[in-house]
């Protein structure tokens, strides 16, 4: 049948409407029916090149003609069963396509003829029975069993004339013969028979069974044979061996089938005819199925010759009471298998009897031999020897067995010539003591008023053999005393025997010294105990140590620290004590405190400056005093930097040591972040604030880790530029400074502030590293903020009581900030520049979590240490840009060498902060003189920022190079 008129009309419509994006197929409609062996044509109209597809496959066997213009014509001559199906016209550029389904009507075959009647489906999959109708008028297409039996209850399917019957979630019980049934012209028609076979699918990777232990021992020249088997519910399984590099074994495989249940078994056998030392290593058997891969290792050890190594042995010296039993055991590793196990006693080989029971056990290359000695006699004391031999080695292990016997008094006599004599024997050799009392025929040692005779006693050891009983003789001279009864007591190993001697005259011994001696000893013991307790309490007190360490030299991984006590101290730092007026305490520890103070004439006679003074408490000891002096020397050695708490002066003569440093009005960074949480505005890099963090609440246990809160919070909501700018006016007074501090503390906090804090701390740490100084306790609690939100690194040292600070955990005999420490510092006590970089990464996490505790919800216990060893790292905090988290993660590299230096970190953060922040920081830095020198005073253009600067040249070396001024004539810039 030809369709030229229809096609011509459609072509005219396409020419009139050329803007359509999808190709158009004519004849129109979803399907086309053509008689068997007739010709038909399909026209595709498109603005670009198209390709015809049949059943979603490219057309290769059918004629395809490309004509001029926008039309592609597909011509099919003598349409047969193979031409039935869906035809698609697909644009090559856009992938857009249109489709039409062609029925090739065959009166004799209502279903398309096919040669595929065996269908294999995986269990759980959806499979299609391809019974495609040749006539679109077929009705009621359904699926039936070939034998007329009902379908399985759980079988669910969908039927379509164009796609066939789709069976969902195939199960093993669906296996069988099926036929498609439909109605055509009121008659029932059936398709051919389809045999459905369901292939079982495993639910897990395959199991592996090794034919030998996982540790195989061989000597050079022997044959290696390793066997590995696996099984699977279907035949889609493979097993193979992996050998160490350079080893080329032969591998033989075989398989067999088990029927109930059906199981496919595969075995791989690896062989080496003659092994060498290079063949040793880790061999791995791998089994693979549809669910994955399973592997089991086999360690092959090659030795030049055989060996026997004892791995466990009972105590070689054994003591047992007579009549008890004793077991002697030896555990050893050996290869090849020992051919001789033997036990001997005093050189005589023992046989397996009821008195000497010998047992042996074998597990792989481990062998155990045990000798049980039943109801030992004293005469069986002596040396027992275990011997083991194999082809190449011999070992011997000896045991000394001592049989404990009760002491016995074997003879006694007297009194004769003013002496009594007592002889005892046993093992161990007994001890003899003499007691006397005034009661006749009584055991003196049981009486409360019994007296032990220690004078005029002569004791001689008669025999003391290495094994068996020893004998001892004791003689007592009684010429000087008169007794009613004498008692000879022999004791050994908790056993006691005695004999009594009756004396004719009775003289009660003098007991004057006994109570005095007891009282003296008791008093001495009490005094010693008190001294021990006091010493222990003193040793347990926390010792103040300066955390900052200055390195003298680096030799590989070994750092040589400078003894800070050996550093020089320049007395130009001295400041008169009477010019300090102390205020409130800013921080306090076990041995010291930091106090706010006012310094008069620090840089000029009429200047007044707010400073922080670190001092010791009266309870401090000499070690703490020396440590504070060391801290003073280290600060003077380091020099000044805008991002560390700089030294302003000191008082070391005429009283206790005072260290005068800059006063930071906003306290520590940790509590500053926690106070500002409710005013935090989250911003993306380079943008103004757009999100206010109103959901976060202050943590109930905010610790005062350093300075107490200086000023009340004042709510301020300004733009990111105005919020950072300082007030500028014609004059500047102390009330102006207080007002400015109150306003700035109340201002909002945004992401640019957090980046600024991170940048400043990195700059400060880079400075310390350039001075070969290691911090060892870098954390937000040890960062102080001053006016302009300038961050300064400090070491609280004695100003913090670490015994009450939960951030410091007892480890050994010290309290350490474990959650801030690198793995090498925790497990190896190694502190380096790289360990400071790790702590800096934790500090970044604190900053971008707005003061949260690191590793939230994780106590410092054995599980915590295990997770750190296994590489656990914290996830990105809530307000951290991805670039900053990348820096954190690089700081936490397990390999210290791969961690970035502080100079690299500074470069990375500089890429994130805004140009205005960089300009502010450079402005501050450029106004920080590099060396002491005179400075002209200009009251109209400069003003003081607390103790960060002064109005004129100071006599103190560091103070003169530590002044920071803001030029009132310069444009207003945000303060970092």
Swiss-Prot record:
Ubiquitinated. Rapidly ubiquitinated after autophosphorylation induced by kitlg/scf binding, leading to internalization and degradation. Residues 537-976 are cytoplasmic. This is Mast/stem cell growth factor receptor kita. Belongs to the protein kinase superfamily. Tyr protein kinase family. CSF-1/PDGF receptor subfamily. It comes from Danio rerio (Zebrafish). Tyrosine-protein kinase that acts as a cell-surface receptor for the cytokine kitlg/scf and plays a role in the regulation of cell survival and proliferation, hematopoiesis, stem cell maintenance, gametogenesis, and in mast cell development, migration and function. Required for the migration of cells in the melanocyte lineage and the survival of embryonic melanocytes. Required for the differentiation of some, but not all, melanocytes. Not essential for hematopoiesis or primordial germ cell development. Disruption phenotype: Defects in the number and distribution of melanocytes. Residues 23-105, 100-199, 206-301, 308-402, 399-504 form the Ig-like C2-type domain.
């Amino acid at each position: 049948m030809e369709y030229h008129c229809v096609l011509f009309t459609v072509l005219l419509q396409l020419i009139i409407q050329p803007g359509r994006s999808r190709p158009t197929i004519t004849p129109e409609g979803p399907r086309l029916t053509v008689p068997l062996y007739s010709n038909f044509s399909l026209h595709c109209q498109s603005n670009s090149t198209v390709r015809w597809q049949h059943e979603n496959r490219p057309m290769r066997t059918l004629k395809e003609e490309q004509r001029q213009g926008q039309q592609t014509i597909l011509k099919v001559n003598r349409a047969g069963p193979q031409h039935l199906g869906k035809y698609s016209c697909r644009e090559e550029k856009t992938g857009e396509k249109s489709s039409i389904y062609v029925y090739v009507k065959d009166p004799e075959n209502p279903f398309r003829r096919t040669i595929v009647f065996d269908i294999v489906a995986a269990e759980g999959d959806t499979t299609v029975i391809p019974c495609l109708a040749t006539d679109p008028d077929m009705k009621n297409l359904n699926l039936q069993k070939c034998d007329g039996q009902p379908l399985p209850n759980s079988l669910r399917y969908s039927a379509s004339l164009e796609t066939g019957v789709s069976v969902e979630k195939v199960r093993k019980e669906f296996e069988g013969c099926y036929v498609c049934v439909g109605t055509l012209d009121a008659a029932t028609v059936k398709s051919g028979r389809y045999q459905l076979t369901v292939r079982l699918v495993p639910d897990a990777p395959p199991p592996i069974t090794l034919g030998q232990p996982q540790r195989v021992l061989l000597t050079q020249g022997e044959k290696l044979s390793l066997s590995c088997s696996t099984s699977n519910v279907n035949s889609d399984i493979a097993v193979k061996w992996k050998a160490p590099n350079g080893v080329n074994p032969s591998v033989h495989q075989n398989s067999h089938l088990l029927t109930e249940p059906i199981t496919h078994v595969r075995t791989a056998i690896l062989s080496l005819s003659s092994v060498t030392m290079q063949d040793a290593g880790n061999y791995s058997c791998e089994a693979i199925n549809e669910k994955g891969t399973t592997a089991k290792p086999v360690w092959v050890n090659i030795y030049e010759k055989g060996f026997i190594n004892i791995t466990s042995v009972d105590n070689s010296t054994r003591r047992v009471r007579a009549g008890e039993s004793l077991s002697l055991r030896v555990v050893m590793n050996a290869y090849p298998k020992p051919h001789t196990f033997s036990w001997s006693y005093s050189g005589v080989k023992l046989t397996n009897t009821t008195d000497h029971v010998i047992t042996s056990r074998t597990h792989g290359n481990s062998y155990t031999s045990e000798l049980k000695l039943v109801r030992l006699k004293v005469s069986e004391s002596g040396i027992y020897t275990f011997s083991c031999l194999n082809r190449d080695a011999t070992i011997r292990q000896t045991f000394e067995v001592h049989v404990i016997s009760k002491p016995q008094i074997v003879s006694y006599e007297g009194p004769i010539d003013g002496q009594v004599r007592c002889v005892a024997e046993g093992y161990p050799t007994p001890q003899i003591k003499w007691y006397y009392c005034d009661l006749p025929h009584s055991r003196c040692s049981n009486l409360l008023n019994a007296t032990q005779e220690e004078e005029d006693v002569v004791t001689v050891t008669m025999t003391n053999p290495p094994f068996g009983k020893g004998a001892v003789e004791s003689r007592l001279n009684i010429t000087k005393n008169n007794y009613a009864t004498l008692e000879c007591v022999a004791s050994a190993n908790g056993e006691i025997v005695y004999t009594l001697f009756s004396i004719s005259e009775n003289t009660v011994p003098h007991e004057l010294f006994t109570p005095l001696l007891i009282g003296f000893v008791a008093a001495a013991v009490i005094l010693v105990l008190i001294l021990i307790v006091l010493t222990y309490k003193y040793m347990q007190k926390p010792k103040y140590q300066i955390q900052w360490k200055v390195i003298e030299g680096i030799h590989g991984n070994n750092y040589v620290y400078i003894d800070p006590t050996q550093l020089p101290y320049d007395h130009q730092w001295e400041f008169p004590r009477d010019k300090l007026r102390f205020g409130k305490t800013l921080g306090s520890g076990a041995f010291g405190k930091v106090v706010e103070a006012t310094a008069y004439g620090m840089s000029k006679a009429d200047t007044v400056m707010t400073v922080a003074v670190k001092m010791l408490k009266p309870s401090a000891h000499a070690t703490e005093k020396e440590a504070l002096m060391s801290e003073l020397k280290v600060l003077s050695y380091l020099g000044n930097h805008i991002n560390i708490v700089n030294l302003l002066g000191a008082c070391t003569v005429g009283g206790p040591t005072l260290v005068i440093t800059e006063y930071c009005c906003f306290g520590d960074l940790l509590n500053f972040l926690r106070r500002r949480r409710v005013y935090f505005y989250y911003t993306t890099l380079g943008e103004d604030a757009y999100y206010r963090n109103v959901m976060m609440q202050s943590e109930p246990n905010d610790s005062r880790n350093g300075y107490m809160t200086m000023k009340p919070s004042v709510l301020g909501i300004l733009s990111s530029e105005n919020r950072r700018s300082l007030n500028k006016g014609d004059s500047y007074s102390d009330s102006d400074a207080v007002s400015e501090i109150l306003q700035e503390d109340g201002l909002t906090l945004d992401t640019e502030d957090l980046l600024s804090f991170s940048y400043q701390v990195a700059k400060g740490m880079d400075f310390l590293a350039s001075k070969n100084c290691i911090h060892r306790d870098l954390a937000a609690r040890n960062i102080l903020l001053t006016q302009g939100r300038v961050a300064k690194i400090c070491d609280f040292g004695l100003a913090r009581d670490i015994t009450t600070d939960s951030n410091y955990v007892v480890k050994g005999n010290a309290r350490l900030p474990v959650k801030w420490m690198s793995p090498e510092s925790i497990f190896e006590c190694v502190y380096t520049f790289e360990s400071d970089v790790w702590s800096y990464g934790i500090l970044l996490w604190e900053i971008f979590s707005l003061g949260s505790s690191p590793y939230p919800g994780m106590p410092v216990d054995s599980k915590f240490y295990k997770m750190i060893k296994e590489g656990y790292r914290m996830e990105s905090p809530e307000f951290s840009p991805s670039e900053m988290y990348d820096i954190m993660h690089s700081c936490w590299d397990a390999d210290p060498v791969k961690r970035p230096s502080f100079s690299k970190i500074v470069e990375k953060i500089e890429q994130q902060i805004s140009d205005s922040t960089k300009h502010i920081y450079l402005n501050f830095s450029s106004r920080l003189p590099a060396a002491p020198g005179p400075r002209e005073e200009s009251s109209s253009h400069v003003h003081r920022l607390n103790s960060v600067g002064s109005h004129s040249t100071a006599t103190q070396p560091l103070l003169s190079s530590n002044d920071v001024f803001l030029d009132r004539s310069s444009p207003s810039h945000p303060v970092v």
